[in-house]
Amino acid sequence: MAEKFTEIRILDNFYQTSSFYPMPVVLVSTMNENGSTNLGPYSLCFPFVVTGGEKHSMLLIARASSNTALNITRTKVCSLNFIPDKKKYMKNCVQLGFPGETSEQKMKNSIFTLQPSTRSGSPTNGLTKFPDIVEEAIQVMECTWDDSQPLPPTPTSAESSYFVLVIDKIIMKQKWKDSLFKGKGFPRIPIDFGFRDNIQFWFSKHSKPYPIKVPGSKASSVETVLYACTRFDPDIKWEKEACAKIVKVPNVFLKRVIGGVVKAAKKEGITIITPEFMDKVQDKRSSEKN
């Protein structure tokens, strides 16, 4: 007999008090008023704008009175440092995240190594430099707060600030850049289950990621895709083998994909879509592999 569901009362911080919700662990580096770097660990940090333009961004939720929130509000810049899953790093994150301490008090206990930002150009808002980044990180997103977004930095209904952070630059260690390009291998990144029992934070390791292919039954026929492609723009011709490259694209996204390929072809002065051109378009990193 199947086990029944039972209701849980929804409390503040429901993601850790009323549910099990896996989260990332991100060290956010910001600039203090004296020019030093502050590190604050956060887990409520998620992709926000993911497609449709150049302003790809992350959403960060932080306590409004925290060093991190105050620094971002003042300087508008920060860096998101994704650190590897090591127990000593998690212990230090718990120390760095303890509320009520000044940045100077917290940073005395930091075991992380800071190095200069990799951003080019001059910082604004009276800064002499950008926030440092964490040398031990697997990858870093260097960001600028988009304060034009309709998210108030300090909602009246909560003690939190919501920051839409436009990603100016992503850097990562060469090993993981190679893995990203090859589509093989993943870094061991910690999983946070939050503060529970009013005593301790809970973290988890993850096992090796595994792939699951899209079912072949979901694919469209080549003839169906060819028909859609030829109708899209009469000035652009498609080889049948090129259409075969996108038969597994869900129908709801097919028009968008075809439009993207046609746009890329016209940009390069191409009038016939070949399988080779499709491979180039589908490889979003082709320009970085030369």
Which residues make up each language-model segment?
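Active-site-proximal mixed secondary-structure blocks
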Residues: M1-P41, F46-L226
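Non-catalytic accessory segments flanking P-loop/AAA+ NTPase cores
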Residues: V222-N290
